[in-house]
Amino acid sequence: VLYYTDHEGKAHEFQLGAYQTNFRTEGAQEFSAVYLGKGTAAEYENVDVKGKLVLVDINQREEWWINFPVYQAHGKGAKALIAVQVGGYGQVDEKALNAQDIAGPPEAAAFSMSFEDSEKLKACLDEKGEITVTLDASSRVMRDVSTYNILGEIPGKRSDRMILLSAHYDSYFSGFQDDNTAVAMMLGIARAFIKMGYQPENTWVFCAMAAEEWGIADSKYDWSTGAYAEVFNVHPEWAGKVIGDFNFELPALSNGNLDGIRCTYEYKDFFEDTLKALPALSPAYPEGVLVSAPIETWSDDFSVAISGIPSMVNEFSAGSFMTTHYHSQYDSDEYYNEAAYRFHHELYGLLLMHLDRQSVAPLNFAEVFEQASASLDVLMCQKSGSRVTALLNLLGQTEEVAEEVYDRIYDINEAGVDSEQCREAENILLKVFKMAQDKFVRLTWEDAVVFPQEAAQNNLRHLKKAIRALKRKTPDAEAAFEALYEIDNNAYAFQF
């Protein structure tokens, strides 16, 4: 809690939000607070912030993540940084507080303040841009602490072949949509099948994941740690046994007339084909369901997929909720959409049953090779002396083989064939899936999923653009710098 007295002698009390950092006052303590715009390096020039609280504005969707201005303040000797959302997140109300993973060291302390409170505080700054405040705070990161993923099963006819359903149970604030409704839906689906006495062909594993929002200190990759630990450390043997993961995020939220499923490339055809054959569901999305690939890094299905388990998630990030209510105290039942929630119960219950009936995991690798081909900058490859024509031919041939394999899988599954040969074939398919994840999946500095050569291609484009700008009759240094900004995270190097 932050306290201060304004110019008229009126006392104010502001509730702050916390990040995963260390800051303990052990009772009320007085500090000087200073406002420094966006908190970039330039705004610290000729300003002494040692031992002070630094107030900054931030837009994490369009500019930079919280760790950049926080570490800048820490490096300048500030006691802590207080971030105010001026765009991007928490835009539902000027009273909104926002929380995100810190993606940095816990020693660089940070808090959040509502826009409304920040405006009141800024109005009381003196001629030096400072104000004396009192802060009573206790924020502590405890290292090497255990948390627990919670598992349950509906035993199938086969115990060695599984389907996973997952949702994370940790949350910021009350977390109604993110992700309590998802855990409830997962349990609701389990309850419905148990009540009807349904025995699946495969064992269904229901996993409430911990530490999705945050779970490891001193790392840029500090989210989805519970899921990562589950599939890499606790149950690495699931890869090769689990034929699919249905991960759920914010399922009681409606993002308009068109719903979405986001999955790995290899399951895109299966979901598209299955959706066409489903019976009419409760009305919620008049434009139907769009299947997209690949999966993204924002949810646990990514951690599950890179372990070798094909995964999907209900599309949850398309609407305005992410900029308004997401990760704020306003994530409550106010945004609850019963029609969407019922629809998702029905949809994923039916998809679960359909996947369960497949004799062989319906993986189609053709989309992977098609997208890999499309991601190649042919002209750039030719100029660099790469054998791009041979590579494209090889990718094309492999795509054709993958289509033939999928057609065979489709026929086997339609016929309901179940044999030892099917098991052997599926074992190979899941190994190929794991290999495809290892060989084809890479991340940009912004954590977008790309093919391995794409980051280098993009950097080369920007380098060439910078060179062209400098080789002009009148060299354009500004244009060259703008091109260099786009290489990796270079833009931040100019800001912090």
Residue ranges and their predicted role:
Residues 38-93, 159:
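A conserved hydrophobic secondary-structure block that centers on an alpha-helix together
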Residues 334-418:
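Charged, amphipathic alpha-helical linkers/stalks
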Residues 61-62, 66, 72, 146-149, ...:
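Acidic/histidine-rich catalytic neighborhood of metal-dependent amide-processing enzymes
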